[in-house]
Amino acid sequence: MPRIKQFVSFLSIILFLGASPAFAKEDTPETLDGTTKVSAEKLIEVLQSSPDLVVIDSRKPSDRAKGFIEGSVALPNTDTNEASLASNIKSKTTPIAFYCNGIKCGRSYAAAKIALGLGYTNIYWFRGGWDEWTQKGLPVMKN
């Protein structure tokens, strides 16, 4: 019986530490120089006013499988490079919007930084990402 108590105590400590804010993912920065940060509503406005806007879903395939913004291109940040961007975007002045899971997900931030470094100049960053989109009840697609 003492072993079970030890195990339960150990498990309780692990669960407590896992729930601790010290172990929570940090928020992404508020801004990314060289990009225009947009809300869900602003992204919709840009989509309506810029038909050539390319929306990049920087999330992992397992996240995208749960749903995505209609018309977005699946391009995880880990696969974002000169060749993958060039194959999805007409020119370095074409408007691009990057999104991921939300403010605690750094994937769209990382992908937008890569695009900036490669000379893309018309970048929107949807920092609130999937979390904001779904919390506002906006339409989603699923495969």
Where are these regions (language model features)?
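Extracytoplasmic/secreted cell-surface and envelope-processing proteins
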Residues: R64-K66, G106-S108, T134-Q135
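N-terminal, post-signal-peptide region of Sec/Tat-exported proteins
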Residues: Q48-S84
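Catalytic cysteine-centered active loop of the rhodanese-like fold, especially the PTP/DSP P-loop
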Residues: S84-D131
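Active-site neighborhoods of enzymes that stabilize oxyanions during catalysis
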Residues: L138-N143
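Flexible, polar/low-complexity N-terminal or interdomain linker segments that lie immediately upstream
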Residues: P2-V54, P61-D63
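Conserved functional loop/turn residues at catalytic and ligand-binding sites
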Residues: F68, G119, G137
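Sec/Tat-exported extracytoplasmic proteins
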Residues: L47-P51, C100, L116, T134-G137
